[in-house]
Amino acid sequence: MHQEESFEVVDPNGKVIGTARRAELHSNPSLIHRVVHVLVFNLQDLLLLQRRSHNKDTAPGKWDTSVGGHVDIGEDIRSAALRELREELGIEGCSVNFLYDYLFSNRQETELVSTFTCVHSGPFRFNREEIAAVRFWSIDEINVQLDSGKISDHFVEEFRRYGKFRCRR
């Protein structure tokens, strides 16, 4: 990722109110920006997680959502989800299903996250400078690891929200 990329700044409802550089968005929690997450399940209902490269500026070496990335300027969230699937895991032609939106905020940033799912069992092609490894996990395996420090804070929040969503269905 290039530090000078710019992305849209949005209000809590997703209405575009401006643009800002990536570095600004990742250092000012008052600037909300859009990201997409795609939870990739296989046919056995196991969830794919990626282990972030140790070179990443956020959550290096931690297990994280299957796919996650910024929404480009002028891009809709479904297109962003499909692009990120292709860029991060080499997945093309996978149908994505929208689940929910939520705000994620910490000391560095605030994201308006749009979460999708898709079913794909592999193979996966990924850039080893970005992603150290991928593997499928059972829901129980993830639950055991949530407080271990091995999973990114972003994904802990995502997984807890997904669990509540899944219980309501």
Spell out what each predicted region is.
Residues 24, 61, 73, 100-102, ...:
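Nudix hydrolase/Nudix homology domain
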Residues 35-67:
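A glycine-rich, hydrophobic loop/mini-helix early in the fold
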Residues 38, 67, 98, 114-116:
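A structural signal for short, well-ordered beta-strand segments
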Residues 7, 46-47, 134-135:
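A residue-level structural signature of the nucleotidyltransferase/glycosyltransferase Rossmann-like core
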Residues 48-49, 66-98:
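The catalytic Nudix box helix
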Residues 2-37, 41-43:
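Acidic, metal-coordinating catalytic segment for phosphate/diphosphate chemistry
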